[in-house]
């Protein structure tokens, strides 16, 4: 089924409101296996809406119109659809009764002829009751095309879609998705590696999405059950993870988790809890962002001992007991400083892990290092590891955010190697 969404309302075209209904509808339709091919917005104009309906009827088998069902003169969706289909508007008894009750309880409200429009549906349509408003929706099929009219306010549209429309549209199959999350590899490189899978996809499908510092892959398939979907998605997932970078590194090494809400931080916090280990941090350029991210999760007192924000050389020396002359000799942006910060954070808090971040957030270079240069140290029983990452071409906020992601990834790898 090819679906098309037409949002009716001049206020959308002028930018007065954001068309969140289209996003909601597309998401919910995808969940039941209905593909949305087109989204369009049109003003409150009969001629332009008629033209758009003509186009939609030729290319889509499901046409959903949102908005324009109210009581004002510019609410003309149902009237225009009826004209396009050569049908009359008729009153829905249930909607009429709701309108009667509404005004009976509000004797001071003036009931004008325009109010009656809200109880009308196109002749032959199945009414879609409005649980939170007065304007009734409708669904009808003409010449192989299903037309649906829905109210514009999201508070009215969402329950109508969830409780009225979707049960009437559901077929034997649904869309099932799985999200793979990758860190340490860019979208362009990932897409190049997976070019054959992407170019030849039919079902299941995969779609890459770039986010700040990471990439996700959404795997989707239509199936009649979760078990059937898992079989198809497992095959595609293994095909993806078995691929290698040009340097011969498996994509499995970059895939850190699943799901829309998962993050490197959540993975690390849960694994620290599972292993019963603790962590402390010493931060310079990130100014406590790593620690604040840890503290976003409940129950972290069992794994987070504390930490230090040592922005200046003097505070690195005073708070972490690193000799100032050594810091001056090596520089605050250096492998040495990252190593000592991590080791001292671990030692002073008696934690299993000590993590450190020092570098150049920008906008100016520091000690000859360009913006985006970051040293991250991780101290543990087995010794201290320091990595250098270059996060160039980013804003100050992005440099700090991505640096913290690298720190969490370093801890994640250490936890997995134990």
UniProtKB/Swiss-Prot annotation:
One family name in Pfam for this protein: CinA_KH
Signal peptide as annotated in the record: none
Gene3D superfamilies for this protein: 3.30.70.2860, CinA-like, MoaB/Mog-like domain
InterPro entries per record: CinA, CinA-like_C, CinA_C, CinA_KH, Competence-induced_CinA, MoaB/Mog-like_dom_sf, MoaB/Mog_dom
Superkingdom, taxonomy of origin: Bacteria
SMART domains from the UniProt entry: MoCF_biosynth (SM00852)
NCBIfam families: cinA_nterm, PncC_domain, PRK00549.1
Family label: Belongs to the CinA family.
Official protein name in the record: Putative competence-damage inducible protein
UniProt organism field: Streptococcus pneumoniae (strain ATCC BAA-255 / R6)
